Amino acid sequence: MSGTVTKGQRNSFIAGIVLFVIGLGSHAWFPALLGVGLIVGAVVAHYAATQKAEALDQPWPWPADFRAAAEGMARPIDPTPKRLLPPDDKTKLVSHVATTPEELATLVADKPPAWPWALFTSVLVQRRNGVAARLRAVASGYQPRTRGPQYDGRGYAGLAQHAIGTFSDLAGQLNGFMLSPAFKGAFGDVDKESTADAEAIKDIANRLMDYHESFLRQAETVLQMPVRSDVLVFVADMGAFALCPLVGYDQFIATMCQRVGEAQDLLPYSDDTVWLDDATLNMDAPDGLMEAVGAQFKRFLN
């Protein structure tokens, strides 16, 4: 492939990603969500000046931290927290993350200290681990080969463009959900657990994971459409892009498990409300991924 960049190529478009951040307040517990959208702009000249044309035939190189996070998707999330202190009898009096429906029912019935956040986290863990095999498949970059019709580059670009639009729509819907009075209201007063509503907490946790299911379906669509061999790198780069929300969910759920563990360590020895660090749900696209995806759009829509 020639590395020459024509005037027409310089005037072509590159896709970008718009990041929408919603903060998680330490008391309101609003997860921070990054949505994604598509930006069209004439920025190919800068890309062409810094990248060789041959790079389009190689998948975007995953940074070590992003790869490690994606590797974690191949395994179930272990809710057992890393302990600050050796466990003792007092620790057992504080809520733990429930990994089975029976444990969840017991948690709701007994309502030990920190039960609202343990209940919320338990639903997330059970729903997430219930789709572990599917997450493992998308993290592996599984691309089935078929004997039927296959998408060419232009056809797959249209599908990818639609998928990015769907990601953006999901982000907007999730934005509204996270900011709704019902989300915060389910947990009641920050310093009065008796005002929390167990059914409401289960409902919002399940709805949060319904969005996770939607992101997962989009990742499967992006990765598993049959394409011609010259489009496989485009699929790989779009697959990395589609993993960003799923990686963000995994990290958020793991952090929530850690916060429950910190409550187990601290609550038995505190006479007042314990304030823990924020937990955030971030879906940032790693550096360079935006340019790689945009270059593939340019390549096939030129």
Where are these regions (language model features)?
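Acidic, glycine/proline-rich intrinsically disordered low-complexity segments
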Residues: 62-64, 299-302
